[in-house]
Every structure is written in structure tokens, then in C-alpha cells.
Amino acid sequence: MQPMKKILIFAVLALVSLQAAAQVEYKASRFGIKSNGLIDNTTSIQKAVDWIAEQGGGTLVFNVGRYLTGSIQLRSGVNIRLNEGAVIVGAANIYAYKGQKGIFWGEGLENVTIFGKGVIDGQGPALKAFIAEQQKKGYVAADVPVPAILSFKDCKGIVLRTFIFRNPATPSLFVAENSEVVEDGCYTDTPL
């Protein structure tokens, strides 16, 4: 009976430890991510997402501020929390997206949640104007893909909860090709 009790206690402790690890939160500022809306945070945010994934998952927390970024590849088990007053601002420069279909994107992801009372602003009008200017100069193809705010392909367990979509560059707020995406309470304050 004693060995069985020890195994049961060990199993419970292991489960609690795994749950605690999955719920670890990391402030964006810890990774040098700037909230002034002027600095391009693409590299810093990507490094933060990658590092959190390497640690076994957790939540990257954005507090009050404006966080300018290009395209960010999400990782399984890494969540994004946008606190009230936090605004992720998509770059108004098509080159910042490196051909990707969204500000936040992923392929083959599992268990990712983007949530909070913050905003993801696609800067759609400015991005479309930049693309038109680059096309006029012959720098960008006429059929260049315009990024949505979010893009998922072949993903499972994606949850989008309570944040605001603003100024999308495309009619689709998010793209979900062959993906399981649950949208719960998100809304847009921008007419599509």
C-alpha cells in the first residue's frame, strides 16, 4: 500500500507542476519589448514567443502601451494576453510581414489562446496605402498577399477571447484554414 500511495502522491504533484508551468506568465517588458508604438518589436516579440515555447509554454503578457510589430509566428502552448490598454499595432509596411498571412500566425499549432481586454490594430488603411505606393513604383507585385490580423493553418485548440480587432487590412479578421478556432467574445469596432 505504501508504494502505491507514493506513486499517487508523485503523480498528483507532477500534474500540479505541469499545470503551474503551463500557467507561467511573462511580461513583455522582460524581453525588451517596447510599448511606445514607435520601435519595431518584431524581433523581440518573436524571441519571447520562441523562448516561452522552449520553457514548455506559458503566457506572454502585454500591459498598457502600443506595441508595433510585423509578423509573429506563434508556437504551441504559448498564449498571448492583452491587458486593458495594450494595443498590438501591425506595421504599415508590407515588408514587415515577410510574406506571411497575418500579424500573428501559425501552422500546425496546438493549444494557443489570445485573450484579454486589449486591441490588435491592423493599421489597414495605412498598410493598403503603403502597398499601393510600392505597387505603383513596381516594387511589389499586384497580387501581393495582404495580411489579416490573425492567420491559422492546420491548427487545433486555438481560442480567441474578448479582445478587440481594429482596422484590418482585409475583410477577414482572421483566417483559419483547416483549423479548430473558437472565438469567444471578440469584436471589432471597425466597419468591414
Question: What is the predicted function of each stretch?
Answer:
Residues I7-L8, L68:
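Small/flexible residues
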Residues I9-F10, A20:
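Cleavable N-terminal signal peptides
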Residues A21-L192:
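Extracellular/periplasmic carbohydrate-active domains that bind, remodel
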Residues M1-I7:
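Positively charged n-region of N-terminal signal peptides that target proteins for export
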Residues L13-A14:
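Short, linear, compositionally biased motifs with a strong N-terminal bias
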